[in-house]
Amino acid sequence: KYLSATQRVYCFGQGGSLVIAMEAWARFITAAPQFQCIEDSHMQAMAAALSTPDDVILFFSYSGATKDMLDVLRPARRRGAKIILVTHFAKSPAAAMADVTLLCGSKEGPLQSGSVAAKMGLLFIIDVLFNEYCRTNPALTEANREATAGAISAKLL
């Protein structure tokens, strides 16, 4: 529901979670132009500071407890943006700020950062969100997917 009724969806993450946020953006941009990914944490903070109640922050963070992440989520929360957090920990500082918390990932220690098992769970959540988005917005997503597929197929030799 949040992803469909929005002006912008920012896909954010830091460190290894940024790669997952970029994957989410790459998947959604084929069907929904309102999805954006900002890689730099300073730029993420600025976008959050200008967010509106019509925006959604889709934040990926295994721990849900990093300073940079909270520096993004606090202003977004103050400005009324919806926050969807994808994390491993239900009881984390970020989960306390989120409108929706999606739990995923296998257990990993600090020396296992970015394990394949944890990433597989995150990719599965992205796939479920994307497929549900397309299912609930068929007219828009089918036309956009055809247009983006055409743009990419033109690049094939």
Residue ranges and their predicted role:
Residues 139-157:
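A short, charged, Gly/Pro-tolerant segment at domain boundaries
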Residues 4-124, 130-137:
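Glycine-rich phosphate-binding loops that contact phosphosugars or nucleotide phosphates
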